[in-house]
UniProtKB/Swiss-Prot annotation:
Residues the entry annotates as binding ATP: 30-37, 149-152, 186-189
One annotated GO molecular function: pantoate-beta-alanine ligase activity
Primary localisation category: cytoplasm
GO biological process, any: pantothenate biosynthetic process
EC number: 6.3.2.1
Keyword set includes ATP-binding: yes
Organism: Escherichia coli O17:K52:H18 (strain UMN026 / ExPEC)
Organism phylogeny: Bacteria, Pseudomonadati, Pseudomonadota, Gammaproteobacteria, Enterobacterales
Keyword tags: ATP-binding, Cytoplasm, Ligase, Nucleotide-binding, Pantothenate biosynthesis
Chain's gene name: panC
The protein's name in its UniProt record: Pantothenate synthetase
Length: 283
């Protein structure tokens, strides 16, 4: 497995792979890898000849400096996991390598609408940072496909739109959420939970599933469903942050024409902001 930290060396390797006619898959990550990331890697390996994993804690997508400062950096352990998975290339640049003049004056990519709605409304600048770094990685790696987890549902929708709008010739693959046996969606942020909070955490998925059951049973008073769900989360020890029921294909309000709904839930548990989602067929 090759570990590359600079843009010139990355470009050199990508040129070689292209000359050899290899099909390249990219898995963008911020490191602190868990089994959910490994599922992305496995999907990439099944679809391509060469797998490139990027590990970069992107300062542009953090709306709170304290979150950036405490985000776990576990590069050595991450590389050991990826080596066992027989990943071909790890791109692990420094912030200086990606943003040589800092983030404030760096050119950015913004996806109107999707960047500022829902999760974007409570995290100003977050999705602009995501679309900027992902587009830069697409330009550098020039992958045939790129794999992203469906846990970050809005992020995946944003990347799909960016790819369509910008004309990137890249297949975007959404990989289903990987869960612990108790239902908790795997996330790097789960590492912020205390042992006691970890016992409470599966309650998020239980509330999510309860909302899904109501929708599948034909209930359509969305405001009431959301209010009750928020109360249930708070009773379980969470601090409900945002609960939305949206059209799964547009992320707009559910209408009588909606065929699928996506339930998006975000809640604080101690210092960890946990998110999850579930798609429900409405027809």
């Amino acid at each position: 497995m090759l570990i590359i930290e600079t843009l010139p060396l990355l470009r050199q390797q990508i040129r070689r792979l292209r000359m050899e006619g290899k099909r390249v898959a990219l898995v963008p990550t911020m490191g602190n890898l868990h089994d959910g990331h490994m599922k992305l890697v496995d999907e990439a390996k099944a679809r391509a000849d060469v797998v490139v994993v990027s590990i970069f804690v992107n300062p542009m997508q953090f709306d709170r400096p304290e979150d950036l400062a405490r985000y776990p950096r576990t590069l050595q352990e991450d590389c050991e996991k990826l080596n066992k998975r027989k990943v071909d290339l790890v791109f692990a640049p420094s912030v200086k390598e990606i943003y040589p003049n800092g983030t404030e004056t760096h050119t950015y990519v913004d996806v109107p609408g999707l960047s500022t709605m829902l999760e974007g409304a409570s995290r100003p600048g977050h999705f602009r940072g995501v679309s900027t770094i992902v587009s830069k990685l697409f330009n550098l790696v020039q992958p045939d496909i790129a794999c992203f987890g469906e846990k970050d549902f809005q992020q995946l929708a944003l990347i799909r739109k960016m790819v369509a709008d910008m004309g990137f010739d890249i297949e975007i693959v959404g990989v289903p959420i990987m869960r612990a046996k108790d239902g908790l969606a795997l996330s790097s942020r789960n590492g912020y939970l205390t042992a006691e909070q970890r016992k409470i955490a599966p309650g998020l998925y239980k509330v999510l599933s309860s909302i899904a059951d109501k929708l599948q049973a034909g209930e359509r008073d969305l405001d009431e469903i959301i209010t009750i769900a928020g109360q249930e989360l708070n009773e379980k020890g969470f601090r409900a942050d945002d609960i939305q029921i949206r059209d799964a294909d547009t992320l707009l309000e559910v209408s009588e024409n909606s065929k699928r709904a996506v339930i998006l839930v975000a809640a604080w548990l101690g210092d960890a902001r946990l998110i999850d989602n579930k798609i429900v067929e409405l027809v």
